[in-house]
Amino acid sequence: MANITAKLVKDLRDKTGAGMMDCKKALNETDGNVEKALEWLRKKGIASAEKKSGRVAAEGSIGSYIHTGSRVGVLLELNCETDFVARGDIFQSLLKDVSMQVAACPNVEYVSIDEIPEDVVKKEKGIEMGRDDLSGKPENIKEKIVEGRIAKRLNELVLLSQPYIKDSSLTVEDLVKQAAAKIGENIKVRRFTRYTLGEGIEKNEMDFADEVASLKSN
């Protein structure tokens, strides 16, 4: 495996405008070949999408999705730059796909890593630091293990980090970037709400004999 240096990642980022993590992933996937990494980013729609990410996305649409059986529902706000794009097929298809993703991921609570409150991060770190399998390990080793576990746990809570349900080689973030590259506008998932039928309601469980007895007493 090629040695992916910080300079190599920076050079690719300067050429593409893509994020550091995307550049590093592209170089890992292409054994450190910059030209192939550039092609990889373009195929993913990342190279051109990143250049648009700083532009204001104040238009868009709120989509809804009701899963089969009507037991799970989702409302999701997806933003873009113009109303024209918001009404287009690519944008509306993305809105539906991301809404379906939320319905399929009951553990997801946040759009991106940046949204996770610091107290949640501290809580997860406290849980991991206290695990029995870390006892007796040197502090520096323990920190590295915990860091990896926390990153994995936090990504489980984030919508953009989820493997896309229709193609697990992509994340939801990849999907959004691909759509942005096709459309030529910045696209942002702003917020979502997931509803589960009966969630939070305490059910009064009663067996058949008790139910019959209660009916007789009325």
UniProtKB/Swiss-Prot annotation:
InterPro entries reported in the protein's UniProt record: EF-Ts_dimer_sf (IPR036402), Transl_elong_EFTs/EF1B (IPR001816), Transl_elong_EFTs/EF1B_dimer (IPR014039), Transl_elong_Ts_CS (IPR018101), UBA-like_sf (IPR009060)
Subcellular location: Cytoplasm
A Gene Ontology molecular function term of the record: translation elongation factor activity
Record region (Involved in Mg(2+) ion dislocation from EF-Tu): 82-85
GO cellular component, one term: cytoplasm
Main location: cytoplasm
Entry similarity comment: Belongs to the EF-Ts family.
Name this polypeptide is given: Elongation factor Ts
Gene: tsf
